[in-house]
Amino acid sequence: MLARDWYYNERRQTGLGSAVASVYDRHDDSDIRARAALTMLGVQRGWRVADIGCGNGVLACEAALMGAEVDAIDISPAMLALAEIQARDRKVAIRTQAAGLLSFAYEPNSYDLIVSEFALHHLPDFWKAVALSRIHGALKPGSSFYLRDIVFVSMPDGPERDVEQWADFNIKNHGFSRDSVVTHMRDEYSTFGWVIERMLTDAGFTLLSADYHAPLHGTYLLRKPKPGEQG
């Protein structure tokens, strides 16, 4: 998509400097979870896989270890630097791309799998829909999209309870500060799970599963239908 003067500036939330990125790296023990997710998704040698919002590159490197050709994409230079270190340490090849959901470069119908974890909430809802349409266009027909993000599963009458539970969960389990939770709620763009589901199906995906777990976390497995299939 060509840049326009009205186009959303993803780099207003490049997110993390090197100091904060190191905190994410230190607390992220996701190797086993990443491997399990990729196994569930059926990753095969020779697949083209994109990890958009790749963070420290754990999942991208695990996919490369399974024989996939991997594009590790992130808007944050600090995170891409961590991903490159991960790849060197594990002796795998990944391609890094400094871009986000609205700006990553792709050839239509080229990926066997796209993964995006905890990146979509950086975009307002209109731009979430644009991003999901781009992901749909980048996937081969019959291929999968695996999405995880911070979403609201309660109605608006329960925000205080849910946000406080989420804050406690992240502080106790991931070592984040309360300030980081406050920043997310005040300045970022998480939305309701049912809104995400509608956006995904409107973008053309078949929703295979939606799992709402832990405070304010949602996991979605999608498929891009083949021509002639019901969406």
Model-derived regions: residue spans:
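A short glycine-rich, Lys/Arg-flanked "PGG" loop and its adjoining helix->strand segment in the class I
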Residues: 129-141
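Conserved beta-strand/loop positions that form the S-adenosyl-L-methionine
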Residues: 52
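Conserved class I S-adenosyl-L-methionine
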Residues: 1-47, 58
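Class I SAM-dependent methyltransferase SAM/SAH-binding core
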Residues: 56-103
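Core SAM-dependent methyltransferase catalytic element
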Residues: 203-231
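A short SAM/SAH-binding and catalytic strip from SAM-dependent methyltransferases
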Residues: 113-127
